[in-house]
């Protein structure tokens, strides 16, 4: 970049490329470096495959345990509250970190992506929680664009709803958070959302349609058994994610050592 500071499209000439000096270790050292980096890459790929398998296992267990033989109910029946987000852009605060405003961009594969999270100050938090103050165990659902994914809010953070989201609060006497989270992400419910979207210019789910989502309601005992299974899988997932993070840091360090 220092070679092309004033051009619109960054580029290097053939002369500049030919002038670049790169280290050239002995061939046996090159082979050793390649072997070490390949091993690190293989382990990273393995950890990612293991994470994908855990996701498949959770979905497979859900299909195995729950079926249409149970009473079919609406989301409105099993929830004490279903509320839409405020239809306004939050006033974000680059300093405050106490009040995360969760948007569709933070809802990825059923989990919260904290890397892109934005935050609001206390006054904006109060404004955006007038309808309902989110609590741990609530489900935040992406209702526009890449709609249909959702997350369970964890304890320890004062969330408010960002744009293009809605919140489901399960009635604890009827439905667990883990079951509702998984059923809202299931193919049958996604198909209902797709059907309600027919002809829409901008893909989205209306709150009236979301309240009418239909799905089986198994006994709480069975829901809790599934929840225990998911929690055990999550422990395994955390271990693998920690291993993956260490491997990625190690690979970057090796790249820096060999080529930096």
Stretch-by-stretch model annotation:
Residues 1-3, 108-120, 139-162, 178-182, ...:
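Short, ligand-facing micro-motifs at secondary-structure edges
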Residues 19-35, 46-86, 212-224, 231-260:
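Non-catalytic DNA-recognition/assembly elements of restriction-modification systems
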Residues 130-133, 158:
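Residue-level "contact hotspot" at macromolecular interaction interfaces
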Residues 4-28, 143, 159-166, 175-178, ...:
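A short glycine-rich beta-alpha junction/loop motif
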Residues 70-112, 125-129:
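Low-complexity, Lys/Gly-biased intrinsically disordered segments
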Residues 6, 127-128, 199, 238:
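Short, solvent-exposed loop/turn positions at domain surfaces
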Residues 54, 133-134:
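Short, well-ordered loop/turn sites that connect or cap secondary structure elements
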């Amino acid at each position: 970049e220092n070679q092309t500071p004033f051009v619109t499209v960054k580029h290097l000439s053939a002369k500049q490329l030919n002038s670049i000096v790169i280290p050239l270790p002995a061939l046996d050292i090159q082979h050793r470096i390649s072997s070490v980096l390949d091993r690190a890459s293989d382990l990273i790929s393995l950890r990612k495959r293991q994470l994908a398998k855990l996701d498949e296992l959770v979905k497979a267990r859900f299909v195995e345990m729950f079926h249409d033989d149970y009473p079919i109910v609406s989301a409105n029946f099993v929830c004490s509250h279903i509320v839409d987000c405020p239809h306004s852009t939050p006033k974000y605060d680059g300093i405050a970190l106490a009040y995360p405003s969760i948007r569709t961009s933070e809802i990825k594969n059923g989990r919260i992506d904290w890397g892109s999270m934005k935050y609001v100050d206390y006054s904006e938090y109060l404004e955006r929680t007038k309808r309902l103050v989110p609590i741990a165990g609530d489900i935040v659902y992406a209702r526009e664009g890449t709609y249909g994914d959702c997350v369970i809010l964890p304890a320890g953070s004062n969330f408010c709803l960002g744009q293009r989201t809605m919140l489901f609060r399960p009635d604890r006497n009827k439905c667990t958070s883990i079951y509702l989270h998984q059923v809202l992400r299931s193919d049958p419910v996604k198909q209902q959302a797709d059907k309600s979207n027919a002809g829409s210019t901008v893909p989205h789910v209306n709150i009236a349609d979301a309240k009418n989502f239909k799905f089986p309601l198994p006994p709480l005992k069975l829901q809790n058994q599934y929840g225990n299974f998911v929690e055990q899988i999550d422990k395994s997932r955390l271990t693998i994610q920690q291993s993956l993070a260490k491997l990625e840091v190690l690979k970057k360090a090796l790249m820096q050592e060999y080529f930096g």
